[in-house]
Structures are given as structure tokens and as C-alpha cells.
């Protein structure tokens, strides 16, 4: 007998109701999963110019054998010779700085080959093309006991052994990717763009539009001010002096949802650089990481915190893992300058990346990415991509790159309760450098860029070639004083403008007053 129309309606409605309930439960479960993420505070520390193999490669031998590290069989040929130079474990204090420009990295990655498939066979060749003969230096890594803070963190928490810099190039483009998933077409330092400020949207803008707080704790200068938007008045109270505020905020449980820590970039007696940029002592970078960890470990926020430690780029040091070159999306349609017109379709060299949280299992090694596409990789754009997920931001992705990048929220998803056995303190660190900082040394390229940023904040960029020339003439000590003064002046003027009721989207336009302000 055929069912009546009423019974058919009842059956259909019943199926509809069941399906609706299932979909609703699934939706609620997914939403509640996002809402219940244990991480409420993400702390990011980006250090300078070290490759994975150089800093962490030897931990495969004595800390965790599952790490994709080195064995000592990794070698590079010496050009015009039958000799090779193989990777060793006797890295020490490095001076001068190995090559890491866009052109230098091309040579390191491709060697003398046709330039299509990375061989990682050109590090020695490139080092020999520069003054100082660093051909053996770039083929050396640190023993775990030489970087004891990292050895302990790798043992206790998570290391990512397939995390790459965002482009095969120097500091600034890669640092720009960390919080904006693009360098806006830059493959090197662009003076005009620096003066204007890079225009792209950042993860800070996304957080702000979603009413989620962030803070930048700086030691010399907040280099996040390379982004033009970050110079707006509305963000001026997000800038904090690290030495005055970080430990206090951590102790009070008042660290912002996204906490960015910037290291010291200038090497002074009694106040050494701790950014790990050669020729700075890596021991001081270890001390900074130890200080940050211990402040977080004793904070009321510890059980909801994820600390991300990474490096902007490899600094010219050898790494054996071939750089990805398939399926890498251009972030925003921009290309690099002539003559190469780089399409931003390749990643840079692998860099050390460590993550710390009581929600991470001991001895975790994260290697292959798990989407969102088959070609996705961990790279600096993974940071804004993951922040978007963790904080359930309604904003769009910043670029095609962070939409593609692998995210790392899974690293804190395997425990049902936070660990209680995480160490309260990390090992003490012995200095590697036997001498004092060279305060009268000339500036590195990166330090010169920081001085030019300070010149913009100071209003001195209106004086034609002044920023470029002053950087060439300054010593490290003079640059530190200039940068410190410029930063303080800009922040003070911006806060005054806010008190006077200026438009929050405005940027204080400083004017130089060289007659009243000394420039050594």
C-alpha cells in the first residue's frame, strides 16, 4: 500500500529534521572546537640570520634522532677543484657576516647549475666569491651543548624541521612576510619604500578590526614600523619598551593576545646585541630566549600561551634541505625588480623554528605540512595564517600566501590537559666571544636599514641624502644613540597628538631640527 501524503510529509520532515540536527551539531562542534582552543596568548620572537643546520642540525645526533638534521656527510664542492668542504660541528663566534643578499642566496641554492632545481651546492662557491674566505665557516654547525637553551627546548617541546624563510633573500623582505604574508614586491631593502612605509595590510590590522589586542615589546626600535599602518596614532599605545614592561606584564598576566618581542640590534658594552645576527654572540640570543621563557613559565598566562621562536632568514649558512619551488603562490601579484623580476614563487632556505607551550608533547618534531593544499609548507606566512585560526578572525586572509601556508595549531592539540612538568628555568649560557662588543665598528646592512627607519621617524628623511649618508658614517654606538632618540621622539610626539584629539588614523609627520638636535 502506498503511503498517504500526510505520512510522506511526516517521513520527509523527520529526515529533514534529523539532517538539520546533524548539521547543526557539526557546526556547533566545529565552532566550539575553535572557541575552546587552549591558546589565548601567542608570543613571537624573530631572531636573525641562522640556518637550521647551522643552529639545530647536530641535535639529530644527541637530542632527537627523528630530526631532519646533519650527519657530517653533507658537503659542497670547491670551485675549480676536486676538493669538497663538508659540514662540521665546530661552529663558533662568526665575524664577518656571510653573504645573504637575493643574488647570494641564488648562488647558494643553485650553485653553478642551470638555476631551475635547487641543489644546495653553492654555499662554498658563494662564500669564496666574497672577501674574508668564509667557505669553511658557512659549513659549520653548533654542537647542542654550545646552544643549551635550544637543546633543552627541543627536548622538552617542539621543533619544526621543515620551516622555510618566505623568499630566498635578506632580512627585510622576510621580516615583512612574518606579519603581512608579503614583502610588497621587495627582494631587498628599498629606500623609497622605507621612507613611505610598506602599505600592505598586516595581521595587526586584522586583530585590531576584530577587537583583539596586541603588543610589540622592543629593545632598540620596533622594526614593525617598516609597515606604514603601524605608524598610525591608533597603534602608538601598542608599542612597549621590553626592559620596562615585558616581565611586569607577564608577571601580572597582562600580556596581549599577540605579543611580539623584538631583540637588541646594536652591540654595546654592557648591553650586547641579542638578535643572533653575525657578528653578534649567539650566547646573548640564548640568554634572551631563556629570559623570555622563564618570564612566561612563571606567568599566570602560562597555561594558555604558545611561544614561537624563529629566524628571519639563514644568513648565508649552509642547509641541506632543498628549498621548495613547486606550487608556491605569488602573494599579491607583485614581482621583484629588474633584471630578475622574481615572481615570489619559491621559498627561501630552511630556518630554525621552535615552539613552546605546556600543551605540546615532549620531543615533538613537526615535519610535513598537513595542508591546506598539497604544496603547502611551513614558512613565515604560517604565523598570520595560524593567528587567524586561533583567534577565529572574521577578516580575510592577508594575501594568497597566508591562505596557502601551513598552519601549526595542531601542535597544541594532542593533550587534554596542560603539562605540569615543564622546566621552570633553562640552562645558563657561557659567552662564545672572548672580546667586548666593537662599539666603533661600521654598521651592518641591516643596522643601516634600521638607522634609515629612525631617520624617517625623526623627520630627517626630508634632507635629501641625509639618512643614507649618516648610516655610512656612523659607528654602532652612534647609531644606537640616534635610533634610541628617534624612536623616543616619535612615540612621544604621537602620544601628544592623541591627547590633542588628532585623527587616530593619522601619522605624525616629524620635521628635522638639526640645529637643535645633535647627530654624531
Swiss-Prot record:
Transmembrane segments: none
Location, primary (coarse class): secreted
GO cellular component: chloroplast; extracellular region
Inducing or repressing factors: Not induced by inorganic phosphate deprivation.
Keywords: Hydrolase, Secreted, Signal
Leader peptide range in chain numbering: 1-31
Subcellular location as annotated: Secreted
Keyword Methyltransferase found: no
Single GO term (MF): phospholipase C activity
Superkingdom assignment: Eukaryota
Organs and tissues of expression: Expressed in roots, leaves, stems, flowers and siliques.
EC nos: 3.1.-.-
Biological process (GO), any one: gametophyte development
Pfam families in alphabetical order: Phosphoesterase
Protein family per UniProt: Belongs to the bacterial phospholipase C family.
Protein name stated in the entry: Non-specific phospholipase C6
Gene field: NPC6
Amino acid at each position: 500500500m502506498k503511503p498517504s501524503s500526510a505520512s510522506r510529509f511526516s517521513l520527509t520532515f523527520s529526515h529533514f529534521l534529523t539532517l538539520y540536527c546533524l548539521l547543526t551539531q557539526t557546526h556547533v562542534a566545529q565552532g566550539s572546537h575553535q572557541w575552546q582552543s587552549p591558546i589565548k596568548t601567542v608570543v613571537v620572537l624573530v631572531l636573525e640570520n641562522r640556518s637550521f643546520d647551522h643552529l639545530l642540525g647536530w641535535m639529530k645526533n644527541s637530542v632527537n634522532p627523528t630530526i631532519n638534521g646533519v650527519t657530517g656527510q653533507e658537503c659542497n664542492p670547491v670551485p675549480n677543484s676536486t676538493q669538497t668542504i663538508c659540514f662540521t660541528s665546530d661552529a663558533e663566534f662568526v665575524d664577518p657576516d656571510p653573504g645573504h643578499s637575493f643574488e647570494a642566496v641564488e648562488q647558494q641554492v643553485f650553485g653553478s647549475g642551470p638555476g631551475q632545481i635547487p641543489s644546495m651546492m653553492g654555499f662554498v662557491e658563494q662564500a669564496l666569491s666574497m672577501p674574508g674566505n668564509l667557505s669553511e665557516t658557512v659549513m659549520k654547525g653548533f654542537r647542542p651543548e654550545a646552544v643549551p637553551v635550544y637543546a633543552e627546548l627541543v627536548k622538552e617541546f617542539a621543533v619544526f624541521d621543515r620551516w622555510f624563510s618566505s623568499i630566498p633573500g635578506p632580512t627585510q623582505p622576510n621580516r615583512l612576510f612574518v606579519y603581512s604574508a608579503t614583502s610588497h614586491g621587495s627582494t631587498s631593502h628599498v629606500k623609497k619604500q622605507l621612507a613611505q612605509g610598506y602599505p600592505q595590510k598586516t595581521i595587526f590590522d586584522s586583530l585590531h578590526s576584530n577587537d583583539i589586542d596586541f603588543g610589540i615589546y622592543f629593545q632598540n626600535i620596533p622594526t614593525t614600523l617598516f609597515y606604514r599602518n603601524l605608524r598610525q596614532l591608533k597603534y602608538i599605545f601598542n608599542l612597549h619598551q621590553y626592559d620596562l614592561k615585558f616581565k611586569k606584564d607577564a608577571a601580572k598576566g597582562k600580556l596581549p593576545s599577540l605579543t611580539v618581542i623584538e631583540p637588541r640590534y646594536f652591540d654595546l658594552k654592557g648591553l650586547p646585541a641579542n638578535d643572533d645576527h653575525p657578528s653578534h654572540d649567539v650566547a646573548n640570543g640564548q640568554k634572551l630566549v631563556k629570559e623570555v621563557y622563564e618570564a612566561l613559565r612563571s606567568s599566570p598566562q602560562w597555561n594558555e600561551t604558545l611561544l614561537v621562536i624563529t629566524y628571519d632568514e639563514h644568513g648565508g649558512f649552509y642547509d641541506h634541505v632543498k628549498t621548495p619551488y613547486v606550487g608556491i603562490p605569488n602573494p599579491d601579484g607583485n614581482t621583484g625588480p629588474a633584471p630578475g623580476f622574481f615572481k615570489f614563487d619559491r621559498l627561501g632556505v630552511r630556518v630554525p623554528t621552535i615552539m613552546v607551550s605546556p600543551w605540546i608533547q615532549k620531543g615533538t618534531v613537526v615535519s610535513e605540512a598537513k595542508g591546506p593544499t598539497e604544496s603547502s609548507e611551513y614558512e613565515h606566512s604560517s604565523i598570520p595564517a595560524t593567528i587567524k585560526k586561533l583567534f577565529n578572525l572574521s577578516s580575510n586572509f592577508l594575501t594568497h600566501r597566508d591562505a596557502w601556508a601551513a598552519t601549526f595549531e595542531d601542535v597544541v592539540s594532542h593533550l587534554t590537559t596542560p603539562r605540569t612538568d615543564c622546566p621552570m628555568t633553562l640552562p645558563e649560557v657561557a659567552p662564545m666571544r672572548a672580546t667586548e662588543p666593537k662599539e666603533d665598528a661600521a654598521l651592518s646592512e641591516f643596522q643601516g636599514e634600521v638607522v634609515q627607519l629612525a631617520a624617517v621617524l625623526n623627520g630627517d628623511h626630508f634632507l635629501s641624502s641625509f639618512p643614507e649618508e649618516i648610516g655610512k658614517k656612523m659607528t654602532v654606538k652612534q647609531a644606537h644613540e640616534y635610533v634610541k632618540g628617534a624612536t623616543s621622539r616619535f612615540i612621544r610626539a604621537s602620544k601628544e597628538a592623541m591627547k590633542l584629539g588628532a585623527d587616530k588614523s593619522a601619522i605624525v609627520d616629524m620635521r628635522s631640527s638639526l640645529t637643535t638636535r645633535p647627530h654624531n
